């Protein structure tokens, strides 16, 4: 049975500013990549955290059937949120421990729903540290952002 991995990343030029998200999906058997799919998208005015969340959401939502998958992210915000903080937020009616509304609540709710139909293992990796699949996800995120970046004026 092949193993399924989603390598996810978000990018933002300014925070807020134009941003993009990228996903590298891989089905692997042993050392052999059986199937690979790349996804990306972006927004004109966003934040890095929103793009990191959208990368994970799109990775899970694109799967056609319930799957066992490892989602690899360089975002401690996403990893800590989905494996820890989210349980308290849900218990507190989507409020933080300080009784403030959770930032990006609509995306956290969407991620919660997206992961519910899968058996997800979440893994954090250090970003920009030479991890080839994470670097590819970063390239995809920057490609997703590109249409939303202002064009540089030529001198």
Swiss-Prot record:
PROSITE patterns named among the record's database cross-references: RNASE_H_1
GO biological process: DNA replication, removal of RNA primer
Gene Ontology cellular-component annotations: cytoplasm
Positions that bind Mg(2+) 2: 9, 138
Domain of life per record: Bacteria
E.C. code: 3.1.26.4
Cell compartment(s), UniProt: Cytoplasm
Pfam assignment, any one: RNase_H
Positions that bind Mg(2+) 1: 9, 52, 74
Cofactors required: Mg(2+)
Domain RNase H type-1: 1-146
UniProt GO molecular function: magnesium ion binding; nucleic acid binding; RNA-DNA hybrid ribonuclease activity
Family: Belongs to the RNase H family.
Subunit text: Monomer.
The name this protein goes by in its record: Ribonuclease H
Source species of the chain: Ruegeria pomeroyi (strain ATCC 700808 / DSM 15171 / DSS-3)
């Amino acid at each position: 049975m092949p193993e399924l991995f989603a390598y996810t990343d978000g990018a933002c030029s300014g925070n807020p500013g134009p941003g993009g998200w990228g996903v590298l999906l891989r089905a692997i058997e042993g050392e052999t990549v059986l199937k690979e799919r790349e996804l990306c998208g972006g927004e004109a005015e966003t934040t890095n955290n929103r793009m990191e969340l959208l990368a994970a959401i799109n990775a899970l939502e694109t799967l056609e059937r319930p799957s066992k998958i490892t989602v690899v992210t360089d975002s401690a915000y996403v990893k800590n949120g989905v494996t820890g903080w989210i349980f308290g937020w849900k218990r507190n009616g989507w409020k933080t421990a300080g009784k403030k509304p959770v930032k990006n609540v609509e995306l956290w709710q969407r991620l919660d729903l997206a992961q519910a139909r899968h058996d997800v293992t979440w893994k954090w990796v250090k970003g920009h540290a030479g991890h080839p699949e994470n670097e590819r996800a970063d390239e995809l995120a920057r490609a997703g952002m590109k249409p939303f970046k202002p064009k540089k004026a030529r001198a």
